[in-house]
């Protein structure tokens, strides 16, 4: 049974966000809409130390104080359908994650479509992962997490890291990850009306924005079709 808070959020998304994803929509319009919604929902300063950092040119933010005060590191890849970033919402979420887990959270701002289509964001996420490895963060507890598009990018990052013989995280947490851009499973259609956020129009549009002309069965786009052998424990 969904909690009262979950039911409220689902209704809010169904009435404010889902109608925006319609045929012929403009990504700039969606960004303006989500920015207005974010401004209404998130107010007040964060009650946690933050630090802006460049990951070899990729902007990112640390959430949490000095490394010595934390039990480990969490690399979080934000969602947003590969074309949106809600910095205030994800800053708040990263702060909560740091507080609850005792880990220092790194939130990179990977490049977004349509200005930077696939594989730009995929490459940025692996670069952020390598940046942490190069600085020894894997020597302590180390986790990877992401939601929606960020969940997909988390899976892809681990698959690429494994194939490159890089150390893998201790575990990964995937929140509603997008794993199949082909939408070939029957449930993708018959559950479309139940989805509180994305309409069938969005499911058809977003791959054309993110990866135009690409084979959607490519595991870097649809990790469902990739090799999951050797990945760390997933939640």
Residue positions per predicted region:
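A glycine/proline-hinged amphipathic helix-loop "lid/cap" segment
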Residues: 1-66
């Amino acid at each position: 049974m969904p909690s009262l808070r979950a039911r409220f959020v689902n209704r809010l998304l169904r009435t404010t966000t889902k109608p925006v994803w319609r045929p012929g929509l403009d990504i700039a319009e969606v960004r303006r809409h989500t920015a207005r919604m974010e401004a209404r929902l998130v107010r007040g300063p964060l009650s946690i130390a933050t630090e802006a950092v460049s990951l070899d040119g990729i902007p990112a933010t640390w959430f949490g104080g000095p490394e010595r005060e934390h039990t480990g590191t969490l690399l979080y890849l934000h969602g947003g359908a590969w074309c949106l970033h809600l910095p205030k919402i994800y800053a708040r979420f990263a702060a909560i994650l740091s507080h609850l887990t005792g880990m220092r959270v790194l939130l990179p701002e990977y490049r977004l479509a349509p200005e930077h289509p696939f594989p730009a964001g995929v490459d940025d996420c692996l670069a952020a992962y390598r940046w942490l490895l190069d600085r020894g963060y894997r020597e302590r507890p180390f986790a990877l997490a992401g939601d929606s598009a960020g969940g997909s990018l988390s899976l892809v990052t681990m698959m690429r890291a494994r194939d490159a013989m890089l150390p893998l995280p201790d575990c990964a947490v995937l929140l509603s990850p997008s794993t199949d851009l082909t939408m070939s499973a029957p449930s993708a259609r018959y559950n479309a009306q139940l989805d509180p956020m994305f309409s069938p129009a969005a499911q058809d549009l977003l791959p054309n924005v993110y990866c135009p002309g690409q084979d959607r069965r490519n595991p870097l786009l649809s990790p469902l079709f990739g090799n999951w052998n050797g990945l760390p424990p997933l939640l």
